[in-house]
């Protein structure tokens, strides 16, 4: 509960007077509220022996609540999970079956969020309205994507994905199904490939928080539970699979990505036996059920993204990394009421894109975006840094620092990638391919005492920085 004006239907105290009452429940037919422990036990199913038993129940046990205003005999009804309803309860269900019953998310509510629906994020309607405002389905050919990559600054759908180099192996090619036809990869087949016990983070859409599941649990939820029987809306957006044998060649990125991935370019430059592991961000499988929503965010380090829809559909709203938009984004991240604010209404110059099965989508560096899933979807995508976007990437990393993004959600080994990039630039002819502003920002970044990088071809970080500064002077005199 967050509102200070709502009073308990039974004790009449509002939430500023509730003396630590742990749980509120909301009527599914009006805006009535009450403390769980205030519900008279004669109105509770299953039948309880004394009121103190209500203290043992938590928000997860609440199935539904109807206040006294919706019963001719002024009876309320609180149903708790795992209950077999009796004759009177069945009659209640029949009388009200045509009502617009909207299941309440009691877990989100008692974690400090306002009253909301279990199967719809509170920003969904605002997102859809904003989507119509900015809808602009721009496309580009694969050949143009490759030839013009350095100057592309807007999100674009690739009109001919089959010619882009993008490839995702099929279930029949993996021998998972006996068919000569193309059978798309799905959650069921993914579970067979990676194993029932493979761990993954599953996001609860309402709270935007992750839970630890196994693939078998996710498969049961996604593949074998009907939408009406799913307890909550969930999605998986952080399953990286580049290390999986079946996907090393079984997933291939677009040529434009392979040609411009900064880690690919610099990682093996001057490599030593003691080098740390290459960042694993190149191949993700993303799985969402219908009505899933991911609120506005920046991909770590402002990375560019490729996004291939294997099945289902997606809706994106994206905003460019202008100074104005990034300022609003920082303010929103720092706002204690962040979850109650739809950021899309505050940003400028948006682009909205709807993606369907087979589509390939490219998101440039630094775009602030939110994603809605109209139907169950299975996606293959990945992130990559570029030489083109050095300054914007460094700006986003600074925003991550300012907004205290946990290290787990930042680009892995980013410091090493930037250090290797500097050494690669100084030992090649590629220094001319970036601006003096980019070099100045690299110098500023590496000069921070918080950045720990041990150069491969220089005695110290200080010597590396000195060489970079000398390059800036040469730029200024040419």
Curated annotation (Swiss-Prot):
The Gene Ontology CC terms held by the record are: nucleus
**Which EC class, in a word?**
oxidoreductase
Cystine pairs: none
What molecular function terms (GO) are annotated for this protein?
A: histone H3K36me/H3K36me2 demethylase activity; zinc ion binding
Q: What superkingdom does the record give?
A: Eukaryota
**Cross-referenced InterPro entries, in alphabetical order?**
JHDM1_Histone_Demethylase, JmjC_dom, Znf_FYVE_PHD, Znf_PHD, Znf_RING/FYVE/PHD
Subcellular location per the Swiss-Prot or TrEMBL entry: Nucleus
Keywords of the record, alphabetical order, are: Chromatin regulator, Dioxygenase, Iron, Metal-binding, Nucleus, Oxidoreductase, Transcription, Transcription regulation, Zinc, Zinc-finger
Q: Which cofactor does it need?
A: Fe(2+)
Residues forming the JmjC domain are 242-401
Q: Which positions does UniProt annotate for Fe cation binding?
A: 297, 299, 369
Cofactor annotation remark: Binds 1 Fe(2+) ion per subunit.
Keyword match Nucleus: yes
Zinc finger residue extent: PHD-type: 6-70
> What reaction(s) does this enzyme catalyze?
N(6),N(6)-dimethyl-L-lysyl(36)-[histone H3] + 2 2-oxoglutarate + 2 O2 = L-lysyl(36)-[histone H3] + 2 formaldehyde + 2 succinate + 2 CO2
Task: Provide the residue positions that the database annotates as binding substrate.
Answer: 294, 314
Show the PANTHER family listed in the entry: PHD/F-BOX CONTAINING PROTEIN
* Protein purpose: Histone demethylase that specifically demethylates 'Lys-36' of histone H3, thereby playing a central role in histone code.
The entry's free-text remark on domains says: The JmjC domain mediates the demethylation activity.
Q: Which family does it belong to?
A: Belongs to the JHDM1 histone demethylase family.
* Record protein name field: JmjC domain-containing histone demethylation protein 1
Annotated source species: Kluyveromyces lactis (strain ATCC 8585 / CBS 2359 / DSM 70799 / NBRC 1267 / NRRL Y-1140 / WM37)
Gene behind the chain: JHD1
